[in-house]
């Protein structure tokens, strides 16, 4: 019975999509992440497989930008969620999964080179989304040229 209670508490605080646990912080954020993960799976199964391979936890924070933490967690910024775009959240997940993949493989490079590679990966994904918001494509292209 004790194990059942622990399992219940863990599942109560997380929403699990495939193998990724998404922290439940309310305000529809979990739904937005779930929609983004579904979009990635539909649009680019290879990037979805990589995401599932390297990420097992999505959380949120109040920072100005999304990032990754340790070797398996993607932290989505409040500002990225509040933009209201599922495509943007999907782009964040794809972008940050690239950073996690580099860590997993032990690939070391300069921060600027790593950001450039992550934006190239993100842009490749964005260009496959029918009707994607132009500002997302423009931002990725701009960041490839000037990653900072």
Task: Say what each PLM segment does.
Residues 3-12:
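Sec-dependent N-terminal signal peptides
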Residues 17-73, 81-82:
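Auxiliary, metal-adjacent structural segments of Zn-dependent hydrolase domains
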Residues 32-35, 88, 92, 113, ...:
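Extracytoplasmic/secreted proteins, especially bacterial periplasmic and envelope-associated proteins
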Residues 75, 100-102, 119-120:
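Structural recognition of the beta-strand scaffold that forms the well-ordered cores
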Residues 76-93:
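Short pre-active-site segment immediately N-terminal to the catalytic Zn-binding motif
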Residues 84, 106-109, 131:
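Surface-exposed, polar/charged faces of alpha-helical domains
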Residues 91-104:
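Active-site recognition of the HExxH zinc-binding catalytic motif
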Residues 111-146:
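Post-HExxH zinc-binding segment in Zn-dependent metallohydrolases
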